[in-house]
Amino acid sequence: NGAGKTTFFNVLSGFVRPAAGSVRAFGVDLLSMAHFRRARWGLRRTFQTEQAIEELSVFDNVAMVHEHSRQGGSRRGDVLDAIAFAGLDADPEASVRTLGAGQRRLVEVARAVVGRPRVVLLDEPAAGLPDEETSHLAEVIRRIPEHTGALAILVDHDMSLVSACCTTTAVLDFGKLIASGPTAAVLRDDAVIRAYLGVA
């Protein structure tokens, strides 16, 4: 905690403006866009706390985000595809309030991948989930780039989840980048081990 992970996401998604520097993705300056334009451009985000609306159905929760889709297409088809991709076995018309914690997290992922996003930001998506549900979620996250063509960025302090999902890893320690590169190499880095375990 305190490494700067959520602040990094807040800058990318437009909730925090940095004092200096730039943020570019796919050749586009994200800082020049209002946060709602970033959504239209194709930036999606999950949060540490659920954002799904309990009173609405699974379908309607995902469909709300489809309004920011960067491509045309069948709204219903796109929404059902996102729900299926996330591996949600709930009835799309079921109220979100009837779902367990793991299924709710999958609703968040479906909201993040609907409408062919360019960048998907996942903020501690497995927090509080048991191992079995975390394993399923990790498999879904791993498939996001292939399924959507999007760049998926995961922030988490669960190194087993990072290892399972990420080919490239960057490590922040109190706001400073201390290592980046292939995940396996980064997780063996002495500076990373010291920062996370206090030993080298």
Where are these regions (language model features)?
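Glycine-rich phosphate-binding loops of nucleotide-dependent enzymes
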Residues: N1-A200
